[in-house]
Amino acid sequence: MGLRLYKPYTASTRNRSVSDFSEITEKKPEKTLTSWVFRSKGRNNRGIITSRHLGGGHKRLYRLIDFKRQKIGILGKVATIEYDPNRNARIVLLHYQDGAKGYILHPRGLKVGGTVVTSPEAPILIGNCLPLKAIPLGTEVHNVELYSGMGGQLSRAAGSSAQIVAKEGRFVTLRLPSGEVRLVSQNCWATIGQVGNVDANNIRIGKAGRMRWLGRRPKVRGVVMNPNDHPHGGGEGRSPIGRKCPVSLWGRLALGERTRKSKKYSNKLILKRRKASK
């Protein structure tokens, strides 16, 4: 799991890097675990853009990932490690002892031929899934449930993991990849280890066309628009934005304004806010 660099034959290869895909063992997905998903491309039912800068991109089949780890007490053997076009993390195809098959996120260090199990009494080994109350302090976990039985929602991106820092009463304290420290019910399940493909955030796109392959359209600066298109627009030549602070297309503060609801019930579960983005 590393990066492959290109010699600077062209301007795009000078600043381009890709994953070396050395951990991939199978090119074609398990057909029974794929489905077609309609991609809205940022449009609503009337065709109006509701999320900007989305559209196009290569065709994809969605892989049905088991975020709930529903096969409790049944041993699963790692058959393949596969590429998933819908996420930066790799996925693992498990063959269970009862004949079923399923995909999970690839934990770093798990290899073909290894075994994993979902159980409250499972050993603390990479890829095993347990309730948070059964996992020792200091352990790195991923695919953590926010609410018991709803499936993993936290720490699912490539290279991410959360750390168990305390246990008190009905709650377990987690330090999340963002730096946020929050309480989660001790009955929520989590998977041991860190998500694989840790170099994903070091990949350099290199050219605009590669972003289009990923389904991302160009982002135009507001300062080069007309005043009827953006609050920053207008002026003669290269003009400043003409405001005290940058704002969004709809006039809301663009830098630093908190967007989380102030009366959200789960605010009391957050002990430390996430680090401010740079």
Swiss-Prot record:
The keyword Secreted does not apply. Residues 222-241 are annotated as: Disordered. One of its GO terms (biological process) is mitochondrial translation. Its main location: plastid. Pfam families: Ribosomal_L2, Ribosomal_L2_C. GO terms for cellular component: chloroplast; mitochondrial large ribosomal subunit. It is found in: Plastid, Chloroplast. PROSITE patterns: RIBOSOMAL_L2. Keywords: Chloroplast, Plastid, Ribonucleoprotein, Ribosomal protein. SMART domains: Ribosomal_L2, Ribosomal_L2_C. GO terms for molecular function: rRNA binding; structural constituent of ribosome; transferase activity. The keyword Transmembrane does not apply. PANTHER family: LARGE RIBOSOMAL SUBUNIT PROTEIN UL2M, RIBOSOMAL PROTEIN L2. Part of the 50S ribosomal subunit. Belongs to the universal ribosomal protein uL2 family. This is Large ribosomal subunit protein uL2c. The lineage of its organism: Eukaryota, Viridiplantae, Chlorophyta, Ulvophyceae, OUU clade.
